[in-house]
Amino acid sequence: MKGRSILQSQEGFTLIEIIAVLIILGILAAVAVPKYVDLMANAERRALDAAVSELNGRETLTWSNIMLSAAGWASDAATFGAVDTDLGPDYTWGGGAPAATGGTLTFGNQSLALNRAASTASSPGRWSTP
């Protein structure tokens, strides 16, 4: 058996290599965390935009069903009352429910004020951002 000193037989990383890796990880974390936060805010805003499209689709479907019914269109209040504005547990309306003229919709940390144009006998109501 060959004789080796204790220092020659030890293997591993040097202190310089460990510090270099920690510095690189710190730089990556400093760059990645703000991007992640921006990504979350952007996703929440896109979810609100999708909700506006969903509300417009529901408004059009409800208006179409009313127009095809025997009674036909009577008033915007009747049309708005028939529209399902519950978008699920992740969305909340300021004040609990929207008004016939609009409301504030919140998803996550993002809120969006919405306006609603009234329906008429010739067109459904439309949701939009100011």
Question: What name fits each language-model region?
Answer:
Residues 1, 23, 36, 55, ...:
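Conserved short hydrophobic patches within well-ordered secondary structure
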Residues 1-13:
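N-terminal leader/signal peptides at the extreme start of proteins
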Residues 11, 17-20:
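Internal alpha-helical transmembrane segments of multi-pass membrane proteins, especially GPCRs
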Residues 19-35:
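Alpha-helical hydrophobic helix detector
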Residues 35-53:
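Aliphatic-rich helix starts adjacent to a transmembrane/signal segment
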Residues 51-69:
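N-terminal alpha-helical signal peptides/signal-anchor transmembrane segments
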Residues 64-118:
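Extracellular/periplasmic head regions of type IV pilus-like filament subunits
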Residues 118-130:
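Short, low-complexity, Pro/Ser/Thr/Gly-rich segments in the mature regions of secreted, periplasmic
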